[in-house]
From Swiss-Prot:
Lineage, broadest ranks: Bacteria, Bacillati, Bacillota, Clostridia, Eubacteriales
Entries under NCBIfam families matching the protein: cbiD
Catalytic activity of the protein: Co-precorrin-5B + S-adenosyl-L-methionine = Co-precorrin-6A + S-adenosyl-L-homocysteine
Name of the gene encoding the protein in the UniProt record: cbiD
One GO process term, biological-process aspect: methylation
Protein family (similarity comment): Belongs to the CbiD family.
Organism encoding this protein: Clostridium tetani (strain Massachusetts / E88)
InterPro entries documented for this protein: CbiD, CbiD_sf
Keywords noted in UniProt: Cobalamin biosynthesis, Methyltransferase, S-adenosyl-L-methionine, Transferase
Pathway(s) served: Cofactor biosynthesis; adenosylcobalamin biosynthesis; cob(II)yrinate a,c-diamide from sirohydrochlorin (anaerobic route): step 6/10
Protein name per its UniProtKB record: Cobalt-precorrin-5B C(1)-methyltransferase
EC number: 2.1.1.195
A GO term, aspect molecular function: cobalt-precorrin-5B C1-methyltransferase activity
Amino acid sequence: MLDMYVMVDGKKLRCGYTTGSCATAAAKAATIMLYNKEKLKTIDIDTPKGVRLHLDIEKINIGENYVECCIIKDGGDDPDATHGMEIWARAEKKDDGYTLKGGKGVGVVMGEGLYVAKGEPAINPVPRTMIESEVKSVLPKDRGVEITIFAPEGKKVAKKTFNPRLNIIGGISILGTSGIVMPMSEESLKQSVELEIRQKIANGHKDLILVFGNIGERKGMEMGLDQSKMVSISNYVGFALDCCRGNGVKDITLVGHIGKMCKIAAGCFNTHSRVADVRLEVLALELALMGYDIDLVKDVYNQKTTEGAVKFLGEGYDELYKRIAEKIAKRIEIYSYGEISPKILMFSMEKILFSE
């Protein structure tokens, strides 16, 4: 267990280590045991973060010309789908040189625009470098080794990750730019957003559909939007727009629930509740600007949620939602320096409020 902590919102949270670090440690340990003929209990590796990891070796299989061993992935206090997985490496003797392969449960990249070439195992560049460096540091002179990284539960676990959206088939990715999992980190989510945008562009899509998550994707499909153009952006509206602009995307459709959309209308481009919450303020202000009675404005403002406010208002407020959508579009145009032309699809849980 990694004894490293960070403070997030006043809470002490334990850090973990990436699948890339697990694969590196397993590969190094397997290589040592392959040529030294003795079992190890632990292994040390360096990480790009500058933290030296001391990891337990969970299981070992020894054959005539190969050794396999595994490290258990530990996500710390920010566990993802891969937390607790066995990440295995097989080291097999060869006459000379070093090669790296992906085995069972490690995905294969089937799309363009990712960090790894199409047809290659989904082992990202930093883990590839880490594995090669650590293995070569213990490989006897004039000896060779073939390393295969595999994860027996990878195919099942991958369904809970971004890999299906990124057209990575058959398993998980071996990831990590620092080797360390920082609790509550936005890095991995943002990286997935950027990768998905790049992949859509590489597949020939020049206009993209940005959704916040599964509900937005489903609503968009119900409205006839093309799923192959959809990018799930979580709360990172501004970051996604920056990625679109940086990759030459000129036209987007933003699909979202009125709660998150109201935040953008107010100029908030990170829609997480701990960053900003102006949902009811936007609705109340717009009603006031439209000249509605102050009692109605107060009633809307005092609702618990935007969903509740929409239900409270009932029918006959199409102009309200149109004005909010127009403000969202204007905010996006300003944010992107006029380089992105947006369309808006806004919904509540029960109905479409605005579509163009």
